């Protein structure tokens, strides 16, 4: 019986002084361990998704952690019968998730995590507003019942939406949500930087929430758009084939 291919996704906001220096080291260990995928490096941290044997993807992650020294890393592992990636790429970027706002230090300045098991109770409180930080085509596929849709085409439009909707956010506990956690984590840093104190985000994002809770209280409506060959998943994480992939 063939071993399943492990697909490891990981990100962390951590200050990396010279990210370009890490590229040859990560390419070397990745290729030696027959790992494929993409790792993005920036001064603000790393964001990667790569596939191989369970042992080897974890060895690459260990090297990434050793080289960058993060306090915490958000990690998720799935399995496949085949490699979803053709080769290993390690790329230098200005940001690991592009918001186009200078001066944010997400590592030091971000909102509080809400665990998936506590999310439903938290977002049904009267003084909480839920903001879905994903792009509009993702929100149209599915979102939380009470979530506000900023109707953005790209994440770079989100800061302008925040500036234009300060009355909506005033006096509220702000709960941010996104697919896997990275975008909503950076969003909390933006809001904290402009003076909002009570800012929160769903740990692990929508996918972790659906996995952990099975949407038992039916607060999630629709499906969750994902950027892989599944296109979208239902609330039990089963693939839905009718949604076409957008990047």
Swiss-Prot record:
Keyword tRNA processing applies: yes
Q: Which residues form the signal peptide?
A: none
Could you say which EC number(s) this protein's record lists? 1.14.-.-
Gene3D superfamilies according to UniProt: 3.30.70.100, Rhodanese-like domain (3.40.250.10)
Q: What class of enzyme is it?
A: oxidoreductase
A Pfam family cross-referenced in the UniProt record is UPF0176_N
NCBIfam families noted in UniProt: PRK01415.1 (NF002397)
**Function of the protein:** Catalyzes oxygen-dependent 5-hydroxyuridine (ho5U) modification at position 34 in tRNAs.
Name of the protein this chain belongs to: tRNA uridine(34) hydroxylase
The encoding gene is trhO
């Amino acid at each position: 019986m063939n071993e399943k291919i492990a697909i490891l996704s990981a990100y962390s906001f951590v200050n990396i002084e010279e990210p370009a220096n890490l590229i040859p080291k990560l390419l070397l260990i990745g290729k030696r361990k027959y790992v494929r995928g993409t790792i993005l490096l920036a001064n603000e941290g790393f964001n990667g998704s790569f596939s191989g044997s369970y042992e080897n993807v974890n060895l690459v992650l260990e090297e990434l952690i050793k080289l960058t020294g993060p306090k915490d890393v958000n990690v998720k592992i799935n399995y496949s019968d085949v490699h979803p990636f053709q080769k290993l790429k390690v790329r230098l970027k200005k940001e690991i998730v592009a918001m186009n706002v200078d001066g944010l230090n997400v590592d030091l300045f971000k909102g509080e995590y809400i665990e998936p098991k506590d999310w439903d109770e938290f977002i049904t409180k009267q003084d909480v507003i839920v903001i879905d930080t994903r792009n509009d085509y993702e929100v149209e596929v599915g979102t939380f019942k009470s979530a506000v849709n900023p109707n953005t085409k790209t994440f770079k439009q989100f800061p302008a939406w925040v500036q234009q909707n300060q009355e909506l956010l005033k006096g509220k506990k702000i709960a941010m949500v996104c697919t896997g956690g990275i975008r909503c984590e950076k969003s909390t840093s933006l809001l904290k930087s402009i003076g909002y104190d009570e800012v929160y985000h769903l740990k692990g994002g929508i996918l972790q929430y659906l996995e952990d809770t099975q949407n038992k209280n039916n607060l999630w409506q629709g499906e969750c758009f994902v950027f892989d060959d599944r296109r979208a998943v239902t609330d039990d994480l089963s693939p839905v084939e009718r949604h076409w992939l957008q990047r």
